[in-house]
C-alpha cells in the first residue's frame, strides 16, 4: 500500500485494545480508531460505561466495531481475560493503548502513604508491563503491532506520579527514556 494523506491513518482490518477508554483521552482514541476503520475493545473497571461507549461506537460505525470488556488493570487475571476476549472477538490485537492509570495522591513525596505509592506503581507501571507481555508475543510473531502508553501533563509539575511515568524501560531506546513524562 502506498501512503498518502488519504490512507495514512487507515486502520481498516486492525484491532485495538484500549484501557481506560470510557471517558477522556481513551474514549477519544477509541472513537477515532473506529472512525479510521479499526475494531476496538472498550475497557474500564465498570461494565455500564464500557457497554455505553461500545454501543455508541457500534451505532455510528456498525455492529461488531466495538466490544465492551470491563477489567481492573491492577488484576493480572482481568488483563488476561481482556486480551483473551479481544483475541476471540477480533482474531488478533494490532494495537494496545495503555491509557488507564490512577493518581491517588498529588503532593510532595514526603506525604505519600505506602498504599498510595503501591497503587501508583501497580496501576501505572506493573499493569502496563503485564499487558504488554501478554500481547507482545503475537505482535512479534506477525512482525507487526503497536504499543502506545499514554502519560499526562502531570510530568510538567513534579509529583510522585512523575517518577512512575519517567522510569526507564529496557525495551525503550535510551533516547526515549523519560520522554513520556513531558507529554
Model-based region annotation:
Residues 1-17:
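Flexible N-terminal pre-Rossmann segment of NAD(P)-dependent oxidoreductases
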Residues 132-133:
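A short, exposed helix-loop element centered on a Lys and neighboring polar residues
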Residues 15, 22-23:
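Conserved glycine-rich cofactor-binding loop
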Residues 107-109, 113-121:
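Substrate-binding pocket helix/loop in short-chain dehydrogenase/reductase
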Residues 152:
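Residue(s) in the substrate-gating loop at a strand-loop-helix junction
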Residues 47-48, 70-82, 114:
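The beta1-alpha1 cofactor-binding region of Rossmann-like NAD(H)/NADP(H)-dependent oxidoreductases
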Residues 36-53:
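Conserved glycine-rich Rossmann-like NAD(P)H-binding loop of the short-chain dehydrogenase/reductase
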Amino acid at each position: 500500500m502506498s501512503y498518502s494523506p488519504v490512507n495514512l491513518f487507515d486502520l481498516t482490518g486492525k484491532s485495538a485494545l484500549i484501557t481506560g477508554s470510557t471517558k477522556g483521552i481513551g474514549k477519544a482514541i477509541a472513537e477515532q480508531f473506529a472512525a479510521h476503520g479499526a475494531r476496538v475493545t472498550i475497557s474500564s473497571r465498570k461494565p455500564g460505561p464500557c457497554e455505553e461507549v461500545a454501543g455508541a461506537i457500534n451505532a455510528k460505525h456498525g455492529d461488531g466495531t466495538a466490544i465492551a470488556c470491563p477489567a481492573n488493570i491492577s488484576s493480572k487475571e482481568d488483563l488476561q481475560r481482556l486480551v483473551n476476549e479481544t483475541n476471540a472477538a477480533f482474531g488478533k490485537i494490532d494495537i494496545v493503548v495503555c491509557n488507564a492509570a490512577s493518581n491517588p495522591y498529588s503532593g510532595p513525596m514526603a506525604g505519600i502513604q505506602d498504599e498510595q505509592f503501591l497503587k501508583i506503581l501497580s496501576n501505572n507501571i506493573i499493569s502496563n508491563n503485564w499487558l504488554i507481555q501478554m500481547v507482545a508475543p503475537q505482535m512479534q510473531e506477525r512482525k507487526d503491532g503497536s504499543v502506545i502508553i499514554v502519560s499526562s501533563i502531570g510530568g510538567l509539575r513534579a509529583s510522585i506520579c512523575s517518577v512512575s511515568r519517567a522510569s526507564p524501560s529496557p525495551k525503550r531506546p535510551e533516547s526515549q527514556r523519560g520522554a513520556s513524562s513531558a507529554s
